Amino acid sequence: MSNQTASIISKSTCKKKTYNILTFDTHERYQTQLAKTGHNFYAFRSDGCKEWNQDYGKQPENYYTLPKNSIYHGLDFDFILSQSKFGQIQASHQINQVLKLPIVSLEHTLPIPSWPDEQFSQLRQMTGDINVFISKYSVGRWGFTGESHEVVHHSVDTSLFKPIEVDKMKAPEGTCVTLNDHVLSVVNDFKSRDYCCNYSGWERITKDLNTKLVGSCSEGLSKPAHSIEQLVTDYNYASVFLNTSTFSPIPTSLLEAMSCGCAVVSTATCMIPEIIEDGVNGYISNDEAVLKSQIQNLLKNPGLAKELGENARQTILEKFNEDSFVNNWNNIFNKAYGLKK
């Protein structure tokens, strides 16, 4: 075996205990889970880019923010993690003209059906050395079925998002929970994202029902929970959680509600039918009249709601647990480090 061949084999199998990963602020809750891999994450920022929002999650201790437009050449980065084809992957390739590192491309979103073929083709070609998707459904929609890729499902912190004892006749001190039987939805910018979150459908489905909306909204429709603990409380006080998304691979709020043991009713879109078995761990349909009827049935039958909620939490424990998430990502990170020259 030549020295060059031995060097290649050695590099492909080696790994570090802790990697230095250059990345971008994207989804706070997802990146909080990602930080549990134990590596160091450094967020690159430029003018106009998204910044970490503390309302959605506390910044982990191993997640650092770099000064704007700085990559600190003194830091020994191991690879770049891009989490979007809409700006981040382009920035990654631009930065890489200097750093020359492997790029891991994670895509959370789906291509919009109305895109012209040329636009889809251009975005489809914006790839990394390793391409990761959050569901098999996403792989198909992006046209990667026959190409090398990785799939890592979301994870939920089930020790935080869990059933808690609540007195639905009394609000905990210092909180603003809704006490009466009600339907909860957690969505940011609901109205302005009607095209994918389906606010108009939500209005029709929940007409004449008691509801509570949580989430940042520039129109003043709702406010975010003032803490993660408050959000967990909101999930536990809700009688039913309603998700009306039409164009989202898998809404994080839906998984969190299930983890809290809340009975869920949802549209049957994207990856959701792979998670929710109708009548077993929730209800799904794309018929608004059916969705409303399912909600009303659960409001009248708290025992049924409790049973579906318990089954929903079990689904999260089995399919969206932290151990699998962390192990899958560490395998990808080891693979990326093996590509470093």
State the predicted function of each range.
Residues 246:
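Aromatic "clamp/platform" in nucleotide-sugar-dependent glycosyltransferases that forms part
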Residues 127-167, 180-188:
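Donor nucleotide-sugar binding/catalytic pocket of nucleotide-sugar-dependent glycosyltransferases
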